[in-house]
A protein has these predicted regions:
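Short, helix-capping/interhelical loops that line the mouth of catalytic, cofactor-
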Residues: 17-26, 73-138, 142-143
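Amphipathic alpha-helix face/heptad-repeat signature
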Residues: 27-34, 121-128, 160-164
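Amphipathic, well-ordered alpha-helical segments in soluble domains
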Residues: 34-37, 41, 71, 128-131, ...
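Short, contiguous alpha-helical
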Residues: 51-97, 149-179
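Acidic interhelical loop/turn segments
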Residues: 43-54, 130-160
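An N-terminal domain-cap segment
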Residues: 21-67, 75-77
Length: 179
């Protein structure tokens, strides 16, 4: 037989989508829309849903959501906007970056965030998502290239914005794909 992929027409032309994402300010609107969608989705999750395995190997849905909640994008961007891209207290110097330790820290921070917030994890995540939208909406037109601390090396504010969109999209899929 013949395989036919029936795909509805896109809501807008691909070029229009690209044009709409060509500035950090427009990508901030993408982040805001994604955050609103994710928060609406989170409100539909049950405690049983949170205990299920996610698409991330050895991580439950709650672990993935705790990972998203435990990321420190907003404070790092705030500091970067003030010209400070040095490591926060307790964070390693860029010169001392170890990728294996970085991965372990991500894992441990997710578990710690999950344990710390327990039954309030979803509301904490929603709060953190609102915080990151607020900080990116506060970036002035000449501040997108400001550097922010990132363990492997300083990153521009706009890079952290793109990273946050990618992380949120990817990890939301990790959850939605199994529920």
């Amino acid at each position: 037989g013949t395989f036919v992929y029936d795909c509805p027409e896109p809501a807008s032309e691909p070029q229009e989508i690209l044009k709409n994402m060509d500035t950090p300010e427009s990508r901030t609107k993408v982040l805001e829309a994604e955050v609103n969608s994710v928060k609406e989705y989170l409100a539909s999750l049950s405690n049983d849903d949170l205990q299920r395995p996610s698409a991330c190997v050895d991580w439950s849905v709650a672990d993935v959501l705790a990972h998203l909640a435990g990321q420190d994008h907003a404070p790092r961007v705030r500091r970067g906007l003030q010209g400070d891209y040095s490591p926060e207290e307790g964070s390693p110097a860029v010169a001392d970056h170890d990728e294996d330790q970085f991965a372990k820290n991500i894992f441990n921070r997710a578990l710690s965030t999950r344990e710390q917030h327990g039954d309030q994890l979803l509301s904490y995540l929603a709060q953190r998502l609102d915080e990151v939208v607020e900080v990116f909406n506060s970036v002035g037109p000449n501040d997108w290239d400001n550097l922010c601390y990132w363990p492997p090396g300083p990153m521009a504010v706009w890079t952290l914005l793109d990273q946050r969109i990618a992380e949120l999209t990817m990890h939301t899929w990790d959850v939605r794909s199994v529920l």
